[in-house]
Amino acid sequence: MPLLDSFTVDHTRMEAPAVRVAKTMQTPKGDTITVFDLRFTAPNKDILSEKGIHTLEHLYAGFMRNHLNGSGVEIIDISPMGCRTGFYMSLIGTPAEQAVADAWVSSMEDVLKVEAQNKIPELNEYQCGTYEMHSLDEAKAIATTVLASGISVNKNDELALSDSMLKELSNH
């Protein structure tokens, strides 16, 4: 099985909340697709609550588009990580990490402005696979933590696992 890019970085040294360029790739037509690791919590130390991350999934994707799309950037998708420590964001373009962090801050501020659970977009059985598994309060708690902590930048070269470490880990 091929080693995925996300498993070549040392998760024990990741800062959170933090932005990281997880991958860039070129389409056959020459567009650049950038995948960002938007790490909300430190791996293996904390996780986002089930209802909180689900509510953020509904809110964050729209808010990030409001703040980041434009001038050569178009978000394709924002999806929660299976480990529940953050989100992956795929987009067309190459925005600077600080621009992504700024949009993230603005999006968390937007989350705090949502007035009631019934204001969560697509919160119904027709548009959501588990529409009863939401908590605006938990999403707001996550947003408050992110805003209080500040958002840093994780760099791949600083987090890269050595070839010898990758080989050792593949033997386990």
Swiss-Prot record:
Cofactor note: Binds 1 Fe cation per subunit.
Highest taxon in the source lineage: Bacteria
Biological process annotations from GO: quorum sensing
GO molecular function: iron ion binding; S-ribosylhomocysteine lyase activity
Segments forming a coiled coil: none
Cofactor(s) recorded in Swiss-Prot or TrEMBL: Fe cation
Reaction equations catalysed: S-(5-deoxy-D-ribos-5-yl)-L-homocysteine = (S)-4,5-dihydroxypentane-2,3-dione + L-homocysteine
Enzyme Commission number, as recorded: 4.4.1.21
Alphabetical list of Gene3D superfamilies matching this protein: S-ribosylhomocysteinase (LuxS) (3.30.1360.80)
InterPro entries from the UniProt entry: LuxS_sf, Metalloenz_LuxS/M16, S-ribosylhomocysteinase
Keywords per UniProt: Autoinducer synthesis, Iron, Lyase, Metal-binding, Quorum sensing
Positions of Fe cation binding: H54, H58, C128
Assembly with partners or alone: Homodimer.
HAMAP family tied to this protein: LuxS (MF_00091)
Function noted in UniProt: Involved in the synthesis of autoinducer 2 (AI-2) which is secreted by bacteria and is used to communicate both the cell density and the metabolic potential of the environment. The regulation of gene expression in response to changes in cell density is called quorum sensing. Catalyzes the transformation of S-ribosylhomocysteine (RHC) to homocysteine (HC) and 4,5-dihydroxy-2,3-pentadione (DPD).
Family as reported in the entry's similarity comment: Belongs to the LuxS family.
UniProt name for this protein: S-ribosylhomocysteine lyase
Gene that produces this protein: luxS
